[in-house]
Amino acid sequence: MGRPLLDLETVQTYVAIAEFQSFTKAAEALGTTPGAISVMLKRLEARLGCKLIERTPRLVRLSAQGATFLNPAREFIAAHDRAVA
């Protein structure tokens, strides 16, 4: 089946969660709800086949896989931005 396809909005959501370390703050920055953020993260984790974020009621932090994926995710967004500029 090959590599999983990634969409820009989902990757942007992941980067926002990683940067803000908060679903609520990421949602505010992206103009959506924490519930929508959670759904998009679950979709991305399913596509990649790994957990990117470790969540507790009071803590959001990157998993080992999430830390590894963060720079490529940022590069993906930057490449998109260059392509449409």
Which ranges hold each PLM region?
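The N-cap/first-turn positions of alpha helices
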Residues: 7-10, 34, 66, 73
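Residues within the DNA-recognition helix of helix-turn-helix
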Residues: 33-43
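Alpha-helical linker/hinge and terminal dimerization helices associated
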Residues: 47-48, 69-85
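Short helix-boundary/capping micro-motifs
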Residues: 16-31
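Alpha-helical residues within the helix-turn-helix
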Residues: 28, 46, 67
